[in-house]
Amino acid sequence: MTELKNDRYLRALLRQPVDVTPVWMMRQAGRYLPEYKATRAQAGDFMSLCKNAELACEVTLQPLRRYPLDAAILFSDILTIPDAMGLGLYFEAGEGPRFTAPVTCKADVDKLPIPDPEDELGYVMNAVRTIRRELKGEVPLIGFSGSPWTLATYMVEGGSSKAFTVIKKMMYADPQALHLLLDKLAKSVTLYLNAQIKAGAQSVMIFDTWGGVLTGRDYQQFSLYYMHKIVDGLLRENDGRRVPVTLFTKGGGQWLEAMAETGCDALGLDWTTDIADARRRVGHKVALQGNMDPSMLYAPPARIEDEVATILAGFGQGEGHVFNLGHGIHQDVPPEHAGAFVEAVHRLSAQYHN
């Protein structure tokens, strides 16, 4: 087993005792940091940064040099799998990700390959190995993937969407085609996350960014069912240590009980869910991650500290809380406000751990 100097993130996910509440930030390697912008400029574009193991490692480590974070997260993108399936990923200025060959029908689904994580996605595994080597056991490394439903939204819509009418048309008019796509994606994500674990990821997270646009029944059928399949297929032990799994559905606060039944170790919460209520509902089964509104980081540090104190008090005494934002950090947040947030979590949380 590789020794970890700081394992409180992994311990909290498994609801084991910790000295203070661990904290990391979604998108902690990102555009709010001037050093990230410099490295991205050096890479040329976003996907070139993702595909260069040394530069991906550099941006992964940048926030850890600034802040005493309790975990590193692989620098990559959720759309690596659709890109490896041959959909022609590109980024339009001001538009976000786009695909040149979106999935429009069952015939398109039938043609999609299941990518080999050590071949078409080998650059991700190289990044994982490089980051693990450079972390030198300081903190654990989180691997991740998008959920099948969230990946499918981009693949069918051809990019980002506000109304999701194209994929919902497929869901209601040709559900068989969508289920075939989701099944193929679930197999791909399982292989991808297991490869990340074998390459050195010590915990994995599934981001279901768009699950919250579904009705409860559709969420069960088209999103949660496939995340459950992935959880069932994941390696849960590696390098002599349990590998915790976190599910995060943005807008999924009403479905926490169903999510906790998947066998995952933790649930991510967005900022619209009350953490005290979430703990009452599912805290006996899973750890909870979250859940400060990312926009709170625009506030003065004293206000940020008040919000941290409120969320810590909401969760209360005992184990099973990883502090995070309710979604990714915004690109124009002052870096010193992120620092005040991390410092406040550690300082104010000690009283909740005996």
UniProtKB/Swiss-Prot annotation:
Keywords: Cytoplasm, Decarboxylase, Lyase, Porphyrin biosynthesis
The organism of origin for this protein: Salmonella typhi
Subcellular location: Cytoplasm
InterPro entries for this protein: UROD/MetE-like_sf, Uroporphyrinogen_deCO2ase_HemE, Uroporphyrinogen_deCOase
Gene3D superfamilies: 3.20.20.210
PANTHER family attached to this UniProt entry: METHYLTETRAHYDROFOLATE:HOMOCYSTEINE METHYLTRANSFERASE RELATED, UROPORPHYRINOGEN DECARBOXYLASE
Residue positions binding substrate: 27-31, 46, 77, 154, 209, 327
Any Gene Ontology CC annotation: cytosol
Pathway participation: Porphyrin-containing compound metabolism; protoporphyrin-IX biosynthesis; coproporphyrinogen-III from 5-aminolevulinate: step 4/4
Location (main, coarse): cytoplasm
GO biological process, one term: protoporphyrinogen IX biosynthetic process from glutamate
Oligomer status and interactors: Homodimer.
Name listed for the protein in its UniProt record: Uroporphyrinogen decarboxylase
Domain of life (superkingdom): Bacteria
Catalytic activity: uroporphyrinogen III + 4 H(+) = coproporphyrinogen III + 4 CO2
This enzyme's EC code(s): 4.1.1.37
Annotated site, Transition state stabilizer, chain positions: 77
Gene Ontology MF terms: uroporphyrinogen decarboxylase activity
Cystine connections: none
Similarity remark: Belongs to the uroporphyrinogen decarboxylase family.
